[in-house]
Amino acid sequence: MTIKVEQAIIHEIAQTHEGQLSCRLRPQPLLNSQAVELMLEELHQSYTSKSGKGFGFFGTHGNDGEANPAFANCLKDYLDGGLGFVEFTGVASKLLQDELGKYDFSQGGFLLLACYSHMASDYLFVALLSAKSSMTVLDDMELTQVNHLDLNNIQLAARIDLTEWQADKESRKYISFIRGRAGRKVADFFLDFMGCVEGINPKAQNKSLMIAVEDFVAGSELTKDERQACRDKVFEYCSERFDAGAEVDIKDLADELADSGMDSFYDFATTGNYDLEEEFPVDKSTLRQLKKFSGTGGGVTISFDGHHLGERVIYDPISDTLLIKGVPANLKDQLHRRLKGE
């Protein structure tokens, strides 16, 4: 187990026969059984590995639009010992019920709240889970339908870094959340019930880092291979941070580059017009451009490793053409077969 579970509970928000939402509150926390530990371990791993998450903080009513501070206030009371875990989660369920009541599309679900620690940080995980039907075989070999929690397709979940929240009140990224498939709008009501305001933009920060790296190598005396090695080093560092659930640390990254003979990146990145935070979450899809060129348009999709540019792949900006030397064998075979058939 990579996490230590402190407390967890599940409450249900469901529709009554009259179409109204109501809460069915569990009166005590879940037992720290193997089933609970395995479920939270699975959720921790899958949540941590999700890319494209949003980041935010608890807003202040009046200063951050209509941010409702009720959830944050209750959470603070719980952490200070003024509220028990069951009482805090019960209030949270009522807040979510009230928020869901503003919309016509909601069917409710099972609200999971879990406090756990991982490495040096304490977290509160909040997720609205749905039930999914499946089939099973009974002892007498008859089929029957059963419901189970759908842990593989969670769309409404957030994680609060309690350690960061308590240590740095100015932080704007101690709450992470899953973005809906159509963008943040899908998860608005879930963030609103917590009073979460979107803060740092990871994609923009990673884009700025990529631009800073490109400017850094362009202004250096590095050879072509050394420049690509620098890009690869940055991508490798960021990938390792992502896999560990950690953030990009510009000073730490600069030290890694310095160990490889590429000095002064920290001063270059922080004094230039890149608006980089000292630390920010990794967005691998953005940084992948350090290693690969790819693009799609007009029915054509092209992707190739960066070190091939200027060698196997030649770009002529004047004629707007790409020359590919050494066509991949499987593509060449398809082309030959098509030409023979014409």
Swiss-Prot record:
Family: Belongs to the YejK family.
Domain of life: Bacteria
InterPro entries membership: Nucleoid_associated_NdpA (IPR007358)
Primary localization class, coarse: cytoplasm
Keyword set includes Transcription: no
UniProt protein name: Nucleoid-associated protein Sama_1557
Cited Pfam families: NA37
GO CC aspect terms: bacterial nucleoid; cytoplasm
Record's subcellular location: Cytoplasm, Nucleoid
Keywords: Cytoplasm
The UniProt record lists the keyword Calcium: no
Disulfides per UniProt: none
A single GO molecular function term of this UniProt record: double-stranded DNA binding
Protein source organism: Shewanella amazonensis (strain ATCC BAA-1098 / SB2B)
